[in-house]
Amino acid sequence: MKKLLLSIMTQMAMQMSMQVAMPLSASAQQLLPYQNANLSAEVRANDLLSRLTLEEKTKLMMDTSPAIGRLGIPQFQWWNEALHGVGRNGFVTVFPITMHMAASWDDTLLYKVFTAVSDEARAKAQEAKKSGNIKRYQSLSFWTPNINIFRDPRWGRGQETYGEDPYLTTRMGLAVVNGLQGQTFDGKPMSAPGVLAPASSQ
């Protein structure tokens, strides 16, 4: 359980460093260790875990994490999909389904597709942030790519994968993650250190 919470808090620390922080309560006006981007993610996550109550930790384990004002933690929505474009969020580009893109064997093209998806997702996330209430399908945390190897046609999510070839799935998965995260095709940051949109491979 501690490893699961540490993993979640590490992800939260990374997400929080990319968001505009909400105003801190009077008790949290000074810079706390978990807010210090110069510390490691593990140190920051452990510090944040030590400050959260059990009830707050429980609430943060859902796909909709409420704001925790006393610690300056903004509300966050963990659920967004981008298998072939930003999912269910108004007018965006819809690309072919994953299996069809895999049939191209063109990981450079897939990288370009997910760079475009990332651009659209960031624009949509900024729109949602202005409203002050980020809902499902409006965050920058994607449940993409699905890199499971598709070996059994009875599985209902096979069309979300890149097929049964491990080499192809590796190439396509890397292209998707690098495109979404704002990195170069070979995984190097384009500019400032960090990522623009984290991808959560399934």
Task: Give the residues covered by each predicted segment.
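Bacterial N-terminal signal peptides
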Residues: S7-P23
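Positively charged n-region of N-terminal signal peptides that target proteins for export
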Residues: M1-L4
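Glycoside hydrolase catalytic-domain context in secreted enzymes
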Residues: L24-Q202
